[in-house]
Amino acid sequence: MNQQYSAMRSNVSMLGKLLGDTIKEALGEDILDKVETIRKLSKSSRAGNEAHRQQLLSTLQNLSNNELLPVARAFNQFLNLTNVAEQYHSISPHGEAASNPVALAKLFTRLKEKNFNNGDLKKAVNELSIELVLTAHPTEIARRTLIHKLVAVNTCLSQLDHDDLADYERNNIMRRLRQLVAQSWHTDEIRKIRPTPIDEAKWGFAMVENSLWEGVPAFLREFNEQLEESIDYSLPVEAVPVRFTSWMGGDRDGNPNVTAEVTRHVLLLSRWKAADLFLKDIQVLVSELSMSECTPEVRKLAGGDEILEPYREIAKKLRTQLSNTLTYLEKQLKGEQVLPPTDLLVDNEQLWQPLYACYQSLKTCGMEIIANGQLLDILRRIRCFGLSLVRIDVRQESTRHTTAISELTQYLELGDYASWSEEEKQAFLLYELHSKRPLIPHNWQPSAETQEVFATCKVIAESPQDAIAAYVISMAKAPSDVLAVHLLLKEAGCPFTLPVAPLFETLDDLNNAENIIQQLMNIQWYRELIHDKQMVMIGYSDSAKDAGVMAAAWAQYRAQDALINVCEKEGITLTLFHGRGGTIGRGGAPAHAALLSQPPGSLKGGLRVTEQGEMIRFKFGLPQVTISSLALYASAILEANLLPPPEPKPEWHQVMDTLSDVSCKMYRDYVREQPDFVPYFRAATPEQELAKLPLGSRPAKRHPAGGVESLRAIPWIFAWTQNRLMLPAWLGAGAALQQVVNDGKQDVLAEMCRDWPFFTTRIGMLEMVFAKADLWLAEYYDHRLVDKNLWPLGQKLRKQLSADIKTVLAISKDEHLMADLPWIAESIALRNVYTDPLNVLQVELLLRSRQQQYSDPQVEQALMVTIAGIAAGMRNTG
């Protein structure tokens, strides 16, 4: 094992020992001995010792009800600490960061070798746009209070990572680590109540405050240094290529808990938090900017010649304005009726202009080193976060708009809008969009659902323009779906044009996306409205649930390609918004690989992508990790735009068409046509029990009485991740690949794997899933939990998985899974030792829970802990 991994393993070992000491202190030697025995048996079982595997099973099966919870908690906490050690390893100078310098430096070297001139590079840098959308359905299982403790553990690991520590310093850090591990152990890791949408929004704001606020300026500083070194170019102060948006408090698709009032509250809360953070920043400037020499502009802003410390005076004025803004927003949040103060900050320019004048003045007066300190960081925060902190997207399902307009047209005795043809809908909508009179009568009393749709549009209309980023229409199926939202916003009196993004998420809708956008582009009124800019969202999770990963991936690729072509032809700047999840079954892939695997030209309009639940913490949970993640994104976008992958050959297209058709048919044959599938799914996974876990504010099902088709993509994936079959992430794909091999096209597949990033990524993602899947554990779930009549189905699926692994290895020409990514393989192996006992224990708990007439709180709690622990072990939930 090389030196890099040994540093991580020694951290894991140290944290494990501290946890062991804590358990011993809290519960005594016997429980610790039991936990240690289970851990050693698990390690030996993983190494292939069958006798120890049987011993592991019997030990866990025979735990008393009193032992269940401590054992489950021990392994859950082991995994949380392992993940911290792994996250630290990725940024440690003695770990992954030692051999993986910031990706940008390597890219600039490659571009120079390919004779790119600096002008091309500067243009690409100036056009760089990364918008990360923090989503509103956190699959983040860990409670916020525990996350704070784990972040503090990471800080301790960083402090220990020095060779020159004095003994007393090391002792102090170790004492702090022991305290943090003990605090975590004595804290209940499972939420007792579901978070509200406002709780979720606060979670997002905490992520900004604790990590992104420091991480973004630090990344831009690093990025700027790389640019100066490589191409002698400095990033303009006003150019901030990174922005953050949130769905928390704005995404009402299928979530009745997100109301117009909730959105209004979250928008106020967001502005309050921004004012609070900027106030702290400005306070630093008040204490630091004591210089007197300045330009006439700054002298005038400060209040004239008699002001001795002009920069400090300007900072003090801003401090007063921010303080007044904070007080006003606090009163509004409490529901008090209050008039806005005359110096209320509502526009980013109010903050930007005086500070930018100070920046220019300091540079002009020879104090560039001071200008480029804290002041520059604040200016960049204004451009990235602004007075809204994070903008929000509003998302709603298309049928809600149709129903609202239909209710209105029937009240006005114009007929039933919902039953009209697409042509009739468009004609009506365009007529009303051109009309100068209002459509909605003042005395009309709509239904509560329709009133909610109108109220949401009113909240948008009354918000500062920079507070709302876009209106996303889920399940968009026709041009009228887009026009309908524009009409609703017009009727609400929205004073600005909000980008409206149709979301195409089923196989049929993806295939029809080009046609819908082309129809919209043919409407003259629409063309004038959008100023040659269109956003389209591609849904990854629902398409994969609908058709399987291979067919969904190809439909997404083809839809993007077609949309790029239609927008290019029409002279439209297209922004593709990717609705990816953290898991493979929901489109997740390592960021760099995922971006390079998209169609050529897909990133010209910038990148807009959702960051889901627990992935937000893994990618952006610490300032240093934020720097690495943003550098990866920036590098991948620049590479994709400057060194686009070659257009795929027609033969590759044909092979993908075959793979898509064959895999989709097999996937649907199982999931939709196989009568035993739903009973098997419900028995072999903790799907029913998952509903009890207070995960996010959104219900697990769109329709409570429905089957698999009504399940949201997150619990669908989550359930299969728990029993280690990982079915949604591979079903159909391997069988389709084998069929193409049988058709004599193995050489073509090898060529695609070698030369086409899209296909290389598909194979790589399958390998990662196969590395996390586990045949014996999946079989164990079946034999203990599933009716014998359903065993043949499970057997068939496992046999298919086994065959698929061989097929993929034959195509990639690797001897074992993840051969190209030893670091990820190492990480999976490290966590398996702790995850396996949780899987075995979960089976036992499911069995006891399902057999009991009355629920036992200890069993229920232990079951929830195993669910959380396996999620931590798999590093994926939904």
Swiss-Prot record:
Does Oxidoreductase appear among the keywords? no
Q: What is its EC number?
A: 4.1.1.31
Name the UniProt key words of this record, in alphabetical order.
Carbon dioxide fixation, Lyase, Magnesium
| Catalytic activity annotation | oxaloacetate + phosphate = phosphoenolpyruvate + hydrogencarbonate
Q: Which GO terms describe its cellular component?
A: cytosol
Task: Name its co-factor(s).
Answer: Mg(2+)
PROSITE patterns named among the record's database cross-references:
PEPCASE_1, PEPCASE_2
A Pfam cross-reference name: PEPcase
Superkingdom in the source lineage: Bacteria
What molecular functions are annotated in GO for this chain?
magnesium ion binding; phosphoenolpyruvate carboxylase activity
Indicate the residues that form the catalytic site: 137, 545
Which GO annotations describe the biological process of this protein?
carbon fixation; oxaloacetate metabolic process; tricarboxylic acid cycle
Which family is it part of?
Answer: Belongs to the PEPCase type 1 family.
Briefly state the protein's biological role.
Forms oxaloacetate, a four-carbon dicarboxylic acid source for the tricarboxylic acid cycle.
**UniProt protein name:** Phosphoenolpyruvate carboxylase
